[in-house]
UniProtKB/Swiss-Prot annotation:
Major location (coarse): endoplasmic reticulum
Protein name: 3beta-hydroxysteroid-dehydrogenase/decarboxylase isoform 3
A GO molecular-function annotation: 3-beta-hydroxysteroid dehydrogenase (NAD+)/C4-decarboxylase activity
Keyword terms: Endoplasmic reticulum, Lipid biosynthesis, Lipid metabolism, Membrane, NAD, Oxidoreductase, Steroid biosynthesis, Steroid metabolism, Sterol biosynthesis, Sterol metabolism, Transmembrane, Transmembrane helix
Record's GO cellular component terms: endoplasmic reticulum; endoplasmic reticulum membrane; plasmodesma
Native organism: Arabidopsis thaliana (Mouse-ear cress)
Membrane-related topology note: Multi-pass membrane protein
Family: Belongs to the 3-beta-HSD family.
Binding site for NAD(+): 166
Pathway involvement of the protein, from the record: Steroid biosynthesis; zymosterol biosynthesis; zymosterol from lanosterol: step 4/6
Reaction equation(s) it catalyzes: a 3beta-hydroxysteroid-4alpha-carboxylate + NADP(+) = a 3-oxosteroid + CO2 + NADPH; a 3beta-hydroxysteroid-4alpha-carboxylate + NAD(+) = a 3-oxosteroid + CO2 + NADH
Record Gene3D superfamilies: NAD(P)-binding Rossmann-like Domain
Length: 561
């Protein structure tokens, strides 16, 4: 449907966008203003309207009077009545400032707020109410959805309480149709993304920053439908005209809205995270194990009274591991909806916006734990492969030394003497090399390179003294016989050293050298994953401990008092 044909007459009509400063609300406001035949009342819970660089169109409209901003709390019906009076249509985009962990507040805003919006529209004589719903209201994660249409029934139980509330709100919108002249419909969009996204893409970015975006839940072959935000806005505007021309098929109905191009969920995620400079997902995890861990962590946090932030992660895990595609034939036929932005162009615009947003953020560069352990100096740069050429040369030189001392057939003393002899001859021979050979400059090693500064000698001497004094104190402590822990530490270390020297010192040194050039590098690459896995392991141990200790305490009590 051509948006310019939404109105048959030329004069401006007034619309209200409730939740107009939310992600999809902003997109709808911009599209309405670009059409030029609307006076837009932007209503949201914020006391003031904060504009940024992308809001130049709204800023001009506010100055010219084609747009106005109103602070409205949907829990307060008189405020809604006031802002909707005289309006032709109300777009209800949903709340933008939910405290997702306060379920009572969420219920008042989502469910009771929807009742207030419906009642206010009827009282103020609004003809059309279009509700921005979600495809989540037919999805509980228990079964895949393939080419689902509007005949799908809502689940009896939802995994997320917020989705349950949204399903209740959608039901209220449908029931309100054709009462006191009010026509209603609901648009169910599937996984909305776009510039200014505050939910899905930021969640992926946070996963990527924490290292979790490297994991694929399940096989990675599941298909999903995504919807670009501007296409959702376009569908809302199409619904306005359709409530007149196709009232019998649109009023009181719900419609699925997508980009009409199902893709693999993990291909989409890979485009986003890789486009923002993060590694693409590559490590597959069993879905059931992940969901069990989420449930365990949620239960532990709730039992400790720490609250829980695992609902979003749990919902994401269900979306990320299930096939979920929808049939939009009803929207195409009765609303005249077709996407105005392709999926590829939508992804490109989203990446461009978030790339600029990430550049503006002042993320402090934090040194990795591996870098700190290695002293954040030249040794760290070599072992962490910051300069691949230097690292390779260092590894090659150490391997040559290793071969020279352990596999040349000479004793350690003989090998050291021969090495010093070769070094001395090389230095002496370099002195006879001309400064230029065939026109190429030969850089000789200056004598000062072999000098050691007095401060370095003093620092080395101080370190030796500190180590010596620590050893003396340790021996004094051992001789007094008071510190058994220290005794076992020293005795164990000496015995381990004895085993290494007596068995195979060469094999031990080779293992240490190989680990140094690989272990620290691997640890730095997967530091966050290892940290979070360790955290989960500790949480599981804590859970097991709480389950076991009460039993132990009960069994230790005497049978007779």
């Amino acid at each position: 449907m051509d948006e310019d044909s939404v109105h048959g007459d030329s004069h401006l009509k007034t619309c209200v966008v409730l939740g107009g400063r939310g992600f999809i609300g902003r997109s709808l406001v911009s599209r309405l203003l670009r059409l030029g035949n609307w006076t837009v009342r932007v209503a949201d819970s914020g006391h003031t309207l904060h504009l940024d660089e992308s809001d130049s169109l709204l800023e001009d409209a506010l100055s010219s009077g084609r747009a106005s901003y109103h602070c409205v709390d949907v829990r307060d019906k008189p405020q809604i009545v006031k802002v909707t009076e005289g309006s032709y249509v109300v777009f209800y985009m949903g709340a933008t400032d939910l405290r997702s962990h306060d379920y009572f507040d969420c219920y008042k805003v989502i469910v009771q707020g929807t009742r207030n919006v419906i009642s206010a529209c009827r009282e103020s004589g609004v003809r059309k109410l279009i509700y921005n719903s979600t495809a989540d209201v037919v999805f509980d994660g228990s079964q895949p959805i393939r080419d689902g249409d509007e005949s799908l029934r809502r689940p009896l139980k939802f995994q997320s309480m917020l989705t349950d509330f949204k399903a209740q709100a959608e039901a209220l919108i449908k029931l309100a149709n054709n009462r006191d002249g009010l026509l209603t419909c609901a648009l169910r969009s599937s996984i909305v993304f776009g510039p200014g996204d505050t939910e899905f893409v930021p969640f992926l970015v946070n996963l990527a920053k924490s290292g979790y975006a490297k994991f694929i839940l399940g096989s990675g072959e599941n298909i999903s439908d995504f919807t670009y935000s501007e296409n959702v806005s376009h569908a809302h505007i199409c619904a306005v005209k359709a409530l007149d021309s196709q009232m019998e098929f649109v009023a009181g109905k719900e419609f699925f809205i997508t980009n009409l191009k199902p893709v693999r969920f993990w291909d989409f995620v890979s485009h986003i995270v890789e486009g923002l400079g993060y590694p693409r997902p590559s490590i597959k995890l069993p879905v059931r194990l992940v969901l069990y861990v989420f449930s365990l962590l949620k239960w532990t946090h709730e039992k400790e009274g720490l609250g829980s932030n695992y609902d979003t992660a749990h919902q994401y895990a269900l979306l990320a591991s299930s096939t979920r595609t929808f049939n939009c034939n009803a929207a195409k036929k009765h609303l005249g909806y077709t996407p105005v932005v392709t999926l590829e162009d939508g992804i490109a615009s989203t990446l461009q916006w978030f790339s600029r947003d990430l550049e503006k953020s002042d993320d402090t560069i934090i040194q990795s734990t591996a870098d700190q352990l290695l002293g954040c100096g030249k040794v760290a740069d070599i072992l962490l492969w910051r300069n691949e050429k230097k690292t390779f040369v260092s590894f090659l030189v150490l391997n040559l030394f290793y071969y020279w001392f352990f596999f040349s057939g000479n004793t350690f003393t003989s090998s050291a003497a021969q090495l010093l002899f070769i070094f001395a001859v090389a230095l002496y021979g370099v002195s006879f090399v001309p400064s230029k050979i065939f026109g190429f400059q030969v850089n000789k090693i200056p004598p000062w390179r072999f000098e050691i500064s007095e401060s370095a000698v003093r620092d080395l001497s101080s370190d030796i003294v500190v180590v010596w004094n620590q050893g003396v104190r340790s021996f004094k402590s051992l001789s007094s016989g008071g510190d058994w822990i220290k005794f076992f530490k020293i005795a164990g270390s000496l015995y381990l050293l004895k085993l290494i020297v007596s068995r195979s010192l060469a094999a031990f040194l080779f293992t240490v050298m190989s680990f140094s050039f690989t272990g620290f590098f691997i640890y730095e690459q997967y530091e966050l994953e290892l940290y979070h896995l360790a955290r989960i392991f500790v949480e599981c141990l804590t859970f097991i401990k709480r389950m076991v200790i009460p039993v132990s305490d009960a069994s230790s009590k005497p049978m007779f008092m």
